[in-house]
Amino acid sequence: MAAGAAGSITTLPALPDDGGGGAFPPGHFKDPKRLYCKNGGFFLRINPDGRVDGVREKSDPHIKLQLQAEERGVVSIKGVSANRFLAMKEDGRLLALKCATEECFFFERLESNNYNTYRSRKYSDWYVALKRTGQYKPGPKTGPGQKAILFLPMSAKS
């Protein structure tokens, strides 16, 4: 295709398979989000005491999350009111830390079903996931294709 020819279509390079779809430059904050889990209809919640779980109540102040691009396709997830970062520990537990560590970075990937997945950068076979009960699902029990790992980012402005 001739570049700039009348009626031509500009083709953009394909996105890498690292989940880098539409990533912002490092340090850029997107608007706060709520992460809605397809499994059980829970919103991911980061509590001030460091616990992580899911809740169905849209007005819960602890479901407002700040996703920050750390590098292409990699985000940290911070609870706005808890002021803590989502982390995955070496045993697969999800909890929230006051300071971001290597355990707080996740590969954000838009899946073909338009849900996002958040895979630990440090423990790369493990995903952020919620069970049908609203409890988090430990990393070693997660994997591709599970409903528990699918999250729909929704605006938290309202």
From Swiss-Prot:
Q: What keywords sit in the KW lines?
A: Angiogenesis, Developmental protein, Differentiation, Growth factor, Heparin-binding, Mitogen, Nucleus, Secreted
Gene Ontology BP, a term: cell differentiation
Secreted keyword on record: yes
Residues that hold heparin according to the record: N39
Q: Which CDD domains match?
A: beta-trefoil_FGF2
Question: Where is it located?
Answer: Secreted; Nucleus
Q: Which Gene Ontology cellular component terms are annotated?
A: cytoplasm; cytosol; extracellular space; nucleolus; nucleus
MF term (GO), any: fibroblast growth factor receptor binding
Q: Tell me yes or no: is Secreted among this UniProt entry's keywords.
A: yes
Q: Where is this region: Heparin-binding?
A: 131-147
Sites annotated Important for interaction with integrin: K131, R132, K137
Give the InterPro entries listed for this entry: Fibroblast_GF_fam, IL1/FGF
List, alphabetically, the PROSITE patterns matched. Answer: HBGF_FGF (PS00247)
Which residues would be cut away as propeptide? 1-12
Task: Please give the function described in this protein's UniProt entry.
Answer: Acts as a ligand for FGFR1, FGFR2, FGFR3 and FGFR4. Also acts as an integrin ligand which is required for FGF2 signaling. Plays an important role in the regulation of cell survival, cell division, cell differentiation and cell migration. Functions as a potent mitogen in vitro. Can induce angiogenesis.
The similarity annotation says: Belongs to the heparin-binding growth factors family.
Q: What is this protein called?
A: Fibroblast growth factor 2
